[in-house]
């Protein structure tokens, strides 16, 4: 069961060479790992550490509102 302090964040994960990079756009925090699962776990840890260290002012300044992720089609010239 989720804790009252838990919040749902977005993770955008992409492959870069031999690693995966995970980005949390709401906080502009990124991490990486050798697999998708490791990158996500490392991102979760980075966000947890940020919340432990950040003061309330930094949290307000850094935290963005809702992030919308979608796909679109474009024609290559």
Regions found by a protein language model. Name each.
Residues 1-12, 37, 41-77:
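Short, charged, surface-exposed hinge/linker loops at domain edges
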Residues 27-36:
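A short, exposed loop/beta-hairpin motif centered on an aromatic-Gly-Thr core
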Residues 10-26:
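Short aromatic-glycine-(Arg/Gly/Cys) micro-motifs in beta-strand/loop hairpins
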